[in-house]
From Swiss-Prot:
CDD domains: HATPase_MutL-MLH-PMS-like, MutL_Trans. InterPro entries: DNA_mismatch_repair_CS, DNA_mismatch_repair_MutL, DNA_mismatch_S5_2-like, HATPase_C_sf, MutL/Mlh/PMS, MutL/Mlh/Pms-like, MutL_C, MutL_C_dimsub. Pfam families: DNA_mis_repair, HATPase_c_3, MutL_C. Keywords: DNA damage, DNA repair. This is DNA mismatch repair protein MutL. One of its GO terms (molecular function) is ATP-dependent DNA damage sensor activity. SMART domains: DNA_mis_repair, MutL_C. One of its GO terms (cellular component) is mismatch repair complex. One of its GO terms (biological process) is mismatch repair. PROSITE patterns: DNA_MISMATCH_REPAIR_1. Coiled coil: none annotated.
Amino acid sequence: MNKIRFLDKYLVQKIAAGESIDRPCSILRELLDNSIDSGATKIEVFLEEGGIQKILIIDNGSGISQEDLKICYLPHTTSKISSEEDLRKIETLGFRGEALSSIAICSNISITSSTTGNESYQIEVENGIEKCFKKQPAINGTIVDVTKIFHNFPARKRFLKQEPIETKMCLKVLEEKIITHPEINFEINLNQKLRKIYFKESLIDRVQNVYGNVIENNKFKVLKKEHENIKIEIFLAPANFSKKSKRHIKTFVNRRPIDQKDLLEAITNGHSRILSPGNFPICYLFLEINPEYIDFNVHPQKKEVRFFNLPFLFKLISDNINNFFDKDTNNYHDVIIKRQLTDDDHLIEMINQSENFNKTSTYDVPQNKNLETEDNTNEPNKNMIQKDVGLRKYNSIIENRPSLKENITNIFSDSFLEFEEPPNKNEEEDIKFNYIGQIFSEFLIVEKANEIYFIDQHAVHEKIIYEKLRNSKKTIQKLLIPIEFTIVDKNIEKIIDSEIEEYKKMDIIISKIGSEKYQLESIPNICNQYENTLINFFQSRRSRTINSLESDLYATIACRKAVKTNDILSVEFSKYLINEFFKLEIKHCPHGRKIYYKISKFELEKKVDRA
């Protein structure tokens, strides 16, 4: 007896519906995609009981003709593609011809539409079967009314969450569409009450409108970049904002929300120097890519994408974010918003003050990108730590720890690196502050402008050295004996092979001497004694970007050269560190940790009930 048989057509449709429609928010996503693809400039959304009871969408798009309305709910019917070639350059949100048929199978659906504005037609479908088709009064656009969701899918309906949770999922879908289509007016109604309106606006304003309350001062930086077939727009939070989860890293490709591990890593790597371990950035990435270079047909809900011939994409994202935090913030577009909350914390008023905002650096101190060497009599010299009166204890520490003395000496010597000339003291005055002292042999206490700073001596010295290294002149150094190393992972091997020429630009010469085998032949002079750091980078290349190679190297060198916890510092050297600290634009160590803690006079008075 035969065991394999053809499935009933209706059963096949129910199986297909179960793949793409798993809860009310899936229905909402598909209906919104159709409205957006129709060219609508206004979309009204009505949800009842989290979409479980009812989902109603009204748009002013191009509409559906009488003939198309009769077949639009049938499987594999679509107006968006007609050939295999169209799959290679998808420009619409929908394209499979499965959404309406899947919705019609698992619910009751009514569609009323007009293409002329003079007359409209309505079709009613229950369980995938047409029940009624009739003429209706004229409307402009389309109305889709979905009710009794999963009434014929009892197992699926049992697994739905409570109304507040389903509502939250629907609002998340709405957020994705609202943020990526600022040219559309959206009106949101929950349980027959108007909850929020988004008016047509720029992408900058829309991002501020939707995500502005994520950062306390409501200020985003906008980074724009164009490269060949790619347009990149990134909204970045200030360096001192981070989260304990990845929830506020969002990526959009051609206006689709995408969950892509590589994009997430590129964003995280770009922030690596300003984030401490366990923290994640607040970042919203928008990519516009020629459809011929991407494939969205890889996930049932189109949450993933494949990129073709774009090997540089992730590096481009990471490098630009990394460079953003290295440059003066004046070069970027500042946006300020003012949020006015109603009783239900939903309606938001936007004020874009970008053109009137007086753009200034975060810290009102002069820049200094040159290392101040021992030749300057006003700077600490080789023996500065031993000169402080009364620090006899430290004299013995220096004698017992020659490495510390050597490290401090090397930082200010020409034998360590070739540095630019120090600034003229007549041209650049020291920053005014009151140095109070050192505590726990770890922190420097400083008073400045009615605020007290507790500065991590190791972290700040590490950061100072790191910045000098990045801006120093470097020379190539050929190794007497090349160092051989092996790359076992085939994917990493391909990456290394493709980047050998880029390494040369960094004065790092490696050559392939066999399958999986390489040798390191030349390195920059500052990398002397740090060859193992280079090798480790190559062997873990999969999850890191080239720009992080320089950062990792300099961070390692700076960490080893900097003063350590438990080192007692002279007043002179402490003041030097503090002066340099206030010149730093980004006050994080190269590994992402914060350098300091600050408390104002007012905050301190509040703690002791004086304010």
